[in-house]
Amino acid sequence: MSSEMEFSQKNKNSEFSEFKDMGLTGLANVGNTCFMNSTLQCISHTYELNRFLDKETYKTRLNKKHDSLILCEWDNLRKLMWSENCIISPGGFVNAMQKVARIKDRVIFTGFVQNDLTEFLSFIFDCFHNSICREVDMVISGTAQTETDELAEKCYNMMKLMYKKEYSEFLNMFYGIFVSQIKSKESSYTNILPEPFFNISVPISPKKTLLDCFDLFTSIEELGDDNKIFNEKTNKKENATKQILFWSLPDILVITLKRFLNNGRKEK
């Protein structure tokens, strides 16, 4: 381990020292809930989220949506998991999750069958967000002077549309923005589209490090042959390039590794 990595790890341990040697609680399987238990263990050890919930200010912002039941039941289960190191049966949380899933017509989470962990995580955090989302004021000022300013303006406008009516602390904590940039190789045509993201699904690079995976995810893609873009100004199809760029990252970045190919085979 390099000295930089050692220093970073020491800082991390010091920053979250109150969680040391605690939260080592197991969750009993209540019927094909391995995917759920794995997800809940990850959430349980997201210390920034724990600190936010420990303040309990979220309780003053709970709305009347059914999603609030998920957040409250999770907070109750989380406190039990951190009260002592033991084994707990998460029956109360499972019942609440299935009830809300039925109301929201998310049939896959209403029974006791295995499900995709990433999809379940997204469902849980959607419920968390919906529990305390509210309208806020957002003002964007200034005039774009450069290409970077124009990009910033598009991102801020997207954030305003996304945040103004339904803001919650979970957006800053878990949601970021990336930009899909398409550039023509035959004209000055450029299209920039900012998009919010909760989870980044990265391909596995031959070199197998996480940074290599991100390099592959953000690499330039050639758009030619059947994938040419249509330029409305020239009324022609043109060769182009496409690239994903990150504008802002969340406090906590959720990453999924694409371990399977389109044909269902597993990456080596």
Residue ranges and their predicted role:
Residues 1-268:
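UBL (ubiquitin/ubiquitin-like) substrate-recognition surfaces
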